[in-house]
Amino acid sequence: METIPYDKRTGKIWFNAKLTDWKDAKVHLLNHGLHYASCVFEGERVYDGEIFKLEEHTERLFYSAKRMGMEMPYNQDEINKACKEIILTQKVRDGYVRPVVWRGSEMMAISAQKNKIHVAVAAWEWGSYFDPKLKLKGIKLNISSWRRPAPNSVPWDTKAAGLYMICTLSKHEAESKGYTDSLMLDHDGNVAEATGANIFFKDSNGTLHTPIPDSFLDGITRRCIIDIAKSSGIKVIERKIKPEEMSNFEGCFLTGTAAEVTPVSQIDNFSFNVCEVIKQLSKSYHNLVRKKVAA
């Protein structure tokens, strides 16, 4: 389905504390965020006109900025208010919110101590990240040739723009080969995550296994699913998982703000079933974000 390019849309964007016309929300070509990846961001879902886990996302945004040496010009309450304001202004009922923080253009070199910190928040209507028909039968992943960097080489626990370069490379490679997404291994060759989502496996006993987030983000949706599973009596084990262990699992799914709960039917040569446990977790998550009482 064709979508309107993001620089051609209409409405307002919250830009440095002002509601700015969408077409006028611009930055200079020579900004540090573009050239040196001095940029952090968040992705938030809107359900029935409310942002799910807004405060947690804002806390992570501020943590990411601090880790990148960026002093936020606004406090968390102001950013929360900005996120709520922009979805009302844009009349977003079921969509996406993108807060983004970047260094400006005062200095153009590796050093950036004098650069102004800019903040913007945009919102738009947005449906499923993956094709809904594919989600019903499970998406297919390859195994990326790129790996998540060692934790002592990057600020791995941030949502920083530069960390997604290898994700784009991995996803493009996967799509060129007919896959929907790509599984990334960590620096030691263990299962890590997909390009923009965490991963879970289900064994024959109904236990869930998920990698320890020690070189990639411990996703907000990931934590929600762990809580839902445990409250439903499902055992969850966080541990290192070798790729060859995937032959022992019956089910697999991804979690993320964009991905929500997405079943996986294949990773490379490993096959999985879209089992009842995964369907129930997806339903429970849907009920949670929509504030519905589980049946």
Summary of predicted features, one role per range:
Residues 1-85, 110-295:
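Helix-start/capping segments and mature chain N-termini
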Residues 80-107, 124:
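Short, acidic/charged, Gly/Pro-enriched secondary-structure junctions
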